[in-house]
């Protein structure tokens, strides 16, 4: 993978991670506002976010030469 492509992938993954964080936060707030609980859904979303975060960290490490 060329460095340029890796940087583009990193930028895309960072945006995806940020959007997922915002969505997760909004979901937590809405559940709280409605007085509802959905731990399984929150766990599922957190796992998905964790996978994207791992991708971001791996790309950052690769680009930093670690």
Give the label of every model feature segment.
Residues 21, 48-66:
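Amphipathic alpha-helical coiled-coil segments
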Residues 11, 39-50:
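Short, charged, amphipathic alpha-helical segments
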Residues 19, 26, 30-33, 37-40, ...:
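Heptad-repeat coiled-coil alpha-helices
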Residues 1-16, 47:
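Short, charge/polar-rich alpha-helical segments
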């Amino acid at each position: 993978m060329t460095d340029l492509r890796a940087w583009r992938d990193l930028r895309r993954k960072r945006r995806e991670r940020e959007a997922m964080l915002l969505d997760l936060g909004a979901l937590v707030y809405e559940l709280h506002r409605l007085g509802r609980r959905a731990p399984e859904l929150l766990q599922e979303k957190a796992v998905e976010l964790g996978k994207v975060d791992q991708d971001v960290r791996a790309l950052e490490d690769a680009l930093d030469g670690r």
